[in-house]
Amino acid sequence: MRFRRRRFGRRRRYYRKRRGGWRRRFRIRRRRPWRRWRVRRWRRSVFRRRGRRARPYRISAWNPKVLRNCRITGWWPVIQCMDGMEWIKYKPMDLRVEANRIFDKQGSKIETEQMGYLMQYGGGWSSGVISLEGLFNENRLWRNIWSKSNDGMDLVRYFGCRIRLYPTENQGYLFWYDTEFDEQQRRMLDEYTQPSVMLQAKNSRLIVCKQKMPIRRRVKSIFIPPPAQLTTQWKFQQELCQFPLFNWACICIDMDTPFDYNGAWRNAWWLMRRLQNGNMEYIERWGRIPMTGDTELPPADDFKAGGVNKNFKPTGIQRIYPIVAVCLVEGNKRVVKWATVHNGPIDRWRKKQTGTLKLSALRRLVLRVCSESETYYKWTASEFTGAFQQDWWPVSGTEYPLCTIKMEPEFENPTVEVWSWKATIPTAGTLKDYFGLSSGQQWKDTDFGRLQLPRSSHNVDFGHKARFGPFCVKKPPVEFRDSAPNPLNIWVKYTFYFQFGGMYQPPTGIQDPCTSNPTYPVRMVGAVTHPKYAGQGGIATQIGDQGITAASLRAISAAPPNTYTQSAFLKAPETEKEEERESETSFTSAESSSEGDGSSDDQAERRAARKRVIKLLLKRLADRPVDNKRRRFSE
């Protein structure tokens, strides 16, 4: 029976409760006098029951007993290099190999050179990862200050970072950051840092030098929000200690002549072939070409003059393969590191800079340890009697043998030895201890393959065509300069916004008022604790073999730092408002804070106003409820 609307009485319900449940009903279309035919046919419309109204559900949370708003302000050196090193990746110095070279030891007296050269660690592009532990290490090196201490606080929240990029005089550069990444992506960052690729990245910022923009010399400020994996919920400092907050990279860029260079070097990068993995050749080789090291060791007579370097075995002027093997012991394990020698250019620069003064030659080998990416291309066993023989030990030409530097034991003069490719392999010595070669016969393909010898820049890209891709800085290599090139230094300033929370023990440390407590000299890192150990203390859980530990004694007897005079970097006495408070709030969300740029006559009022704005912002972020948000409680 069809459902019809009655012309009289009460209107019937669209849905009728029947034995089989609710049944759908359809409207009855009546003909209208004003339209007889319709272009589109009518469809039956269904009366549907309205769903249940979503009701908001309030989720409440409580903040810790005590809150501390902390701003970490400091600076980073992001690029350190010389002209001609823009294609090299910056790397930290290997203190064991590069910065500490013992050339003489007489009893307990050790003569060494502990200073490194810019060539050993410099580079025109760099990358890194920022974490709370890294900020603590920077504080110990006097490179940042903490407005409030984290000592005694168990919990922490992160609200983002602000970075200020300063333009240089003559060199433009790119700065890039990423907050969502994994460890595998971070290791594959070399190809992504090529200037033509990074120029298209979403989070990259181009900083033009002052020479190109003489009028607009403003400092560019960017805000980096917290990672998507983090929310504004509280976390223990031990959990957030090594969590990567963001990943960054910085690289020099050439905007005047991005495509061409002079005729002395091959630069037809647009003619390079496309590889099987989809990358262009100049992108594939970016960051994977080692520096051009010396092919000759220093003269033995000059190097051993005065009775030093007694373990230097070569005689005369010895030619070598440009990549040497540094053999040492780390953690009771024999390790081989590949490095290049740069005594030639540094000796040349020193003698030219001094002018009238007559300097002696260097008494140590200037070594630069190759990074993992620079040893990407290696010789195979089948190439020993092929391409490798044609270049480095031809039958009727000059031979470039393998050089090993044995730094075992640590506080002794290293042993420098040379191994000919045409001679027999000894049954004992360095080759047996570190490479397992002791056949006592001529070199074979299998013996050469066990070395895993990296390819030098002569074999990978001696013409420098790959490193001269689009937008790369095009300058002759630093090794070919007659005098020392000019340095390039780029640095940034940062401000991190954290909030520490917890409930520390009551202050029990009382100082003698008759004893002087000087503000100077500055006690830099006395009030900041490593995030891994922050908040740990007490007698029951911190008793070692010799009694109460140092951390427990400090927590029991020391007053909690809560003023500027007790902060990491001691400032002048200031009047503070009470920030440690109790509060009950709902979940909050991190919002980016901004600081205005400009100039003012009264700097004190400007700093005070900025401080009040930041305190008010952090207070609103911590105490803002979420009653106005509607959520469906479905669990």
UniProtKB/Swiss-Prot annotation:
Compartments reported by the entry: Virion
Entry's Gene Ontology cellular component terms: T=1 icosahedral viral capsid
Alphabetically ordered keywords of this record: Capsid protein, T=1 icosahedral capsid protein, Virion
InterPro entries: TTvirus_Unk (IPR004219)
Region (Disordered): 571-608
Residue ranges, compositional bias (Low complexity): 585-597
Pfam family, one: TT_ORF1
Biased composition (Basic and acidic residues): 573-584
Function in brief: Self-assembles to form an icosahedral capsid with a T=1 symmetry, about 30 nm in diameter, and consisting of 60 capsid proteins. The capsid encapsulates the genomic DNA. Capsid protein is involved in attachment and entry into the host cell.
Name under which the protein is recorded: Capsid protein
Organism in which the protein naturally occurs: Torque teno sus virus 1 (isolate Sd-TTV31)
